[in-house]
Amino acid sequence: MEKKTPERQIQAKKYLDEYDIENVISEMLNSLLHEKDPHPYVYMIKYLASLMTEDERKEFNLEIPEPYPTAHPVVKYPHFSDSCKNLLKKYLNRDSFVKLKKIKTKFGNNINSMTKLTELLPDDKIGCILSDGDCINSYYDFLIPIIDEAHKINSKKLDEYQINSYSKIFNCDLGLNELKGYLKKLIFSFSRNVQEFPFNNFSAGNNKIAEVAEFLQSQIEDKIGQGSLPQMKKYELSKNKDEIDNILKKINFNEKWMISANLKQSWPENRFVYISNDNSIIILINFCDHLQVLKLFNENDLDIEKGYNELIEIIQQLSLVITFETHKQYGYLTTNINLIGDGFKILSDIILKNTDKIPIEGSNINEFLNGCNFDDIVINKEGNDIHYITSNSCKLSMKMDIFINLYINQLAGMSKLFNNNKEGKKISFDRINLQDSKDIVFQNIKDAYEETFDEIKYNLSSSGTNINNRIEPVFKGYIPNNLGILFKDKSEYLSFSPFVRNYLLKSQGFDINIKEHIHGKEENYNLVSIEGEELNKIESLHVYLFRNIDGFSFPSSKDNSNDQIEKLIKEAIVNINSKEKIIEYYSLTENKTEADKIIKENKLIFHCEKLVNGGIDSDFPKNRGILKFLNFPYIFGVVNDICHIKFCISMQNPKEKMSPHLVHLVKMNNEFFRYLKFNYNKQIGFMTASPIYLGTGMRIELKMKLNKLRFEDVKKKLENTEFVAENNKDGIVIINKTTIGESETYLLCKLLENVKNIIKNDL
């Protein structure tokens, strides 16, 4: 029979743990043995006095003169609870601890200064902190696996961090309508530490925290006086506790984490808060880090871009006069390992309704939230509303603008699923089993899905979809293999970006995390100069430029706005025709006879006519139409197919020179770009419904008949080029395999150059 622990013993243990007495006594004895002071009792009294604040000593009439002994803490292997599953427990073992316990940073901090968090807050996902800017250098081999897993990076492949490389411009208009009325709080923040000072958890003993506070106050107040920062009111925690408590409550300050990370030494001295006159900007001094600058958004005015740029301006101004602690690989160093890099964090408070009517197949709200990989989740009930308070930090593996968009998308998707799910839409996070295929497009889609599924399966677009919603039509055979997969809107490209990156790496060797697609990068290529009699051997040429208009879901979704798209395109035509009529529009409903004739004669295609089951709107041919360019009989436009507009050249047995038409195609694309804001992203270029066209949005199909050369000869000649050959019963078809990273003009020039060389070899 198991012996029961006496109640008195339980209470005694509880008392010792509450005041950390065993640890204090062991560290005091360690310090005494280290110094071997000839007056041990006096030494111990002074040691204990050093643990109290000056105010506490006065309160209890303790007059104990300085100097106080220097602490020599006992370095102990951290205690891990049975339920603890953090990264510290995963990567720390007793063998490695033998070496680590002997190491100190240049500020005198040891391994226990980083690991106390795991004992006080075993649920923390990481379990350790950085106590100063020298931690990574001193404990490199120990910390790197933890940083790599927390940030989903490989330090061996990590480029040097670009300090102060803030970008003010980014596009974040996704999903905000879904959040109206439900998003009660949204806060952006930057955290920084001053160089050559230990961080707040071990600054108190040598009064460094006071130096940091004095320095930061002087710099902030100078900037306010110069008008470089907004007018702000200052509060001192030791004098304005109630006011500061209200501010901390307003921003959902995580006091539990701060206490567990041992950041309340000498509390409340040398803690200050600045708040702007409009209450939207808050600056914290000496809380979790030396400096934290926050932007609070008004739930009725979610101007994300303006607020973000305002915050960037403040942190840039402070960077001019303050040197922050950085690492050449890991960027800005913060106490919280999740925050290193940009030091950027988002916190939000969103109301979710109907969570009991789960739209998630085989799962529940808690499982889903845990899968979302938020750093923190707190659930509060206020009246009839349940508030989900989540926060996340921008990891080293992600660019800040993409991180913000992803976070906003996730919130919008959650709101769509639970608050605005009028269709009763369900969503599944179970892996779909796809069969291997000989079709390279389909196989690349399959492989990209399988390799990134676990990473992105809980990622939601602003319309509440996940990657399975896009893969399911492929799985059921609703979408032809040559289209691969059809996305619904640009938010899906951001939410499923790991899948998109993987697919582009497989299909084109293009890494969107490293390279960018820049539209209009024409180099020095001249289409006209490539003309030649060899091109007369070409039987047909089809060139397509796919474009979608910003602010609308793609036509490949059922909730698109085809009527608005058609109206915008008609307005653009009126503007382009204002000087001279060069474009005629034929509606498939109002001008059916003429439109059908143009489609038949020029072999134009409407994919959407055959893709109703694949998620395409079923109202075909409503709001569809054809553009005819009057001076260029081989150039057309198709409205509201799988993209909002498709510019195309369709030349059968061309008798005329091709270059003028190719030049005009690019010109007309740019002309429409003046009046229509196309969906464009500098990483992936023009956002087309199918990722196989990303970048230029271009598809080229050129057919020719040869006398001598066989298909295998042509295929070999196109190796290491941007093109591939396909064997067709009527001839050889050359198709561009490259769509991203090069300009439209470059690809067209390279096409004609390669075709000329092939035909020369055939003559």
Could you say what each language-model-derived stretch is?
Residues 56, 63-340, 344-345, 356-701, ...:
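Long, Pro/Ser/Thr-rich low-complexity/intrinsically disordered regulatory tracts in eukaryotic proteins
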Residues 1-82:
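Phospho-regulatory, low-complexity terminal regions
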